[in-house]
């Protein structure tokens, strides 16, 4: 069986954050996960180990692979279920399995921002490049996925360079500010705490800082990085360990860390609300897995929003850019066809390689026979003639035998094929009896 492309995954279209956080891969787990995925196929009849890459973000977890194993789809879904210890019947309804051109189209759309919650956002392209880099370091990339991702990045660049897909987009960070303004009439009068110091927190800090908040504080596990980010926006840093004791000081809390477990629990928030004498707290949890226990959202004076909640606001700004979407989709469709042509051409490579191997074996055998003839003193001209005759006979033996065995339409097709091979073959009208 030829190598087949396959994408298995879940995203914000197919699964809520409560499930997405359970199938997310922390960065440090991706390389070991790729290793275990490849090991699944060691006992299968397919001769080659699969190529694989894992893309894991707040909005999606996807496994891209290239394999010649017919059972790859079911094996990949079962592996994802087993790896995350989620019952298959619970996970399967939310999983999409995209083969061949569908997988290619999906990769192009994801990198171009067409499949993002924030239409046209650029962060996903960097995340995909990081996923490819990690897979490369893990030794799980090969010819097929390398080619897929290189073309994916080229398509994303083309889409962003020739369409207005990213123009006037409402980012998650901007959506967070809009929601805060619904709770607090003046963000400028509020104290804002950011937990984490990654790219998403940096974007949020940029948007909130533009509102001139009363105070801006960054709490991060790495103190130096948190201090550097806080200084950039005229704020100050706070040790993450101080969070439980000082949470009540802040009106707005935005969290996005790489923690695999919640860092803000129900009890801590209850104490903060009590200390604030029930003044409202606006909380945004942009992390997947979530940083804030979901039960916090049930508290009377807490307004908790997740990435899925912010998505509703983001989608309000997507409708106005449908012309750019149509233009981007047209570009992608053309590039999908181009890639599939390359993929189809790859399927003949083993055949060509086999033909070369056979022809070279024939050549070596006849050259060795000619050397023996020369060694025993045969006439060189006769040896050359015998060599060329033997090579000619053996090289045309296969095509000639195939023609003799063929009947009817198969024979006609073979004749046309042979005429294409041998450009100087006489036409049928030239081969009639004279």
Swiss-Prot record:
- Keyword RNA-binding listed? The answer is no
Record has Oxidoreductase as a keyword: yes
- Which residues does substrate bind? 57-60, 116, 121-123, 127
Please write the reaction equations for the catalytic activity of this protein: (S)-4-amino-5-oxopentanoate + tRNA(Glu) + NADP(+) = L-glutamyl-tRNA(Glu) + NADPH + H(+)
InterPro entries in UniProt: 4pyrrol_synth_GluRdtase, 4pyrrol_synth_GluRdtase_dimer, 4pyrrol_synth_GluRdtase_N, GluRdtase_CS, GluRdtase_dimer_dom_sf, GluRdtase_N_sf, NAD(P)-bd_dom_sf, Shikm_DH/Glu-tRNA_Rdtase
- Entry keyword set: NADP, Oxidoreductase, Porphyrin biosynthesis
The residues responsible for catalysis, as annotated, are: 58 (nucleophile)
A molecular function (GO) term: glutamyl-tRNA reductase activity
The record's Gene3D superfamilies line, in alphabetical order, gives: Glutamyl-tRNA reductase, N-terminal domain, NAD(P)-binding Rossmann-like Domain
| Amino-acid positions noted as binding NADP(+) in the UniProt annotation, renumbered to this chain | 196-201
Entry's EC annotation: 1.2.1.70
GO process annotations (BP):
protoporphyrinogen IX biosynthetic process from glutamate
Q: In which pathway does it act?
A: Porphyrin-containing compound metabolism; protoporphyrin-IX biosynthesis; 5-aminolevulinate from L-glutamyl-tRNA(Glu): step 1/2
The positions annotated as site (Important for activity) read 106
Kindly list any coiled-coil regions of this protein.
none
SUPFAM superfamilies reported for this sequence: Glutamyl tRNA-reductase catalytic, N-terminal domain (SSF69742), Glutamyl tRNA-reductase dimerization domain (SSF69075), NAD(P)-binding Rossmann-fold domains (SSF51735)
By sequence similarity, the record places it as follows:
Belongs to the glutamyl-tRNA reductase family.
How the protein assembles, per its UniProt entry?
A: Homodimer.
Q: Which HAMAP family match?
A: Glu_tRNA_reductase (MF_00087)
Q: Any other noteworthy remark?
A: During catalysis, the active site Cys acts as a nucleophile attacking the alpha-carbonyl group of tRNA-bound glutamate with the formation of a thioester intermediate between enzyme and glutamate, and the concomitant release of tRNA(Glu). The thioester intermediate is finally reduced by direct hydride transfer from NADPH, to form the product GSA.
Domain topic, free-text comment: Possesses an unusual extended V-shaped dimeric structure with each monomer consisting of three distinct domains arranged along a curved 'spinal' alpha-helix. The N-terminal catalytic domain specifically recognizes the glutamate moiety of the substrate. The second domain is the NADPH-binding domain, and the third C-terminal domain is responsible for dimerization.
**Function in brief:** Catalyzes the NADPH-dependent reduction of glutamyl-tRNA(Glu) to glutamate 1-semialdehyde (GSA).
The name under which this protein is listed is Glutamyl-tRNA reductase
> Its gene?
hemA
